Amino acid sequence: FWDGRAKHLAEQAGGPPLNPVEMGMKDKASVVKRIAENQAVKDYITKHWGEEIWQDDEKIYAIMEQALAAFQQLDLFAQFSSKYDRTLAGQDKFTEQEALGKALFFDKEKTTCSNCHQLNDKDHREETFTNYRYFNLGVPKNEALIAHNKLGQDWVDNGLLDNPMVKGDIAQKGKFKVPTLRNVAVTAPYMHNGVFKELRTVLLFL
């Protein structure tokens, strides 16, 4: 999550099913009931944990979280097979404009993009394009999102400050996790609240 409230991937996986604006399931029991509708999944769980496991919604939900976390850590989710990766491997070439963009991106003095959007400054292979840290960029409110969720005009997204693990450190107010730039051209809208519709707007803002 952008505010870092999930301690690990399994905990994050358990969030969306019960979130009213994502999957909107009523409770864990409802999710477990839906899981049981898939006979192959039900048979697998029964085989490994026994028939009695279906009497414990909490345990089934935890199994789901762990399974999703394990799946999301497969190389399938990070194949590093983009044109950028192929070029580093000598299997492709950047256009002149792309090469200029790369030079600007990694410029540590002028554009400074890679100050936040780079994990390893010694080896650009298998780069995730985020340092996984948190910053307050002063991103404007997304009024449309606030209205849609009926939060009220005075509502403020405090970001990291609302994370229970931060414990009221006011210096963390408005900070959000640096996102990866992998597939950034096709993942609009942008910023933690989706306030910018176009990538060019992000560049002008920053």
Model-derived features: where do they sit?
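Post-cleavage N-terminal segment of exported redox proteins
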Residues: 20, 29-99, 103, 107-108, ...
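Intrinsic-disorder/low-complexity, polar/charged segments
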Residues: 8, 27, 55-56, 198
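Secondary-structure transition/capping residues
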Residues: 20, 24, 79, 112-113, ...
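Detector for methionine-enriched segments
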Residues: 23-25, 64, 165, 191
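Glycine/proline-centered hinge or cleavage motifs at structural transition points of membrane proteins
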Residues: 2-37
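Short glycine/threonine-rich turn/loop motifs
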Residues: 1-14, 83-205
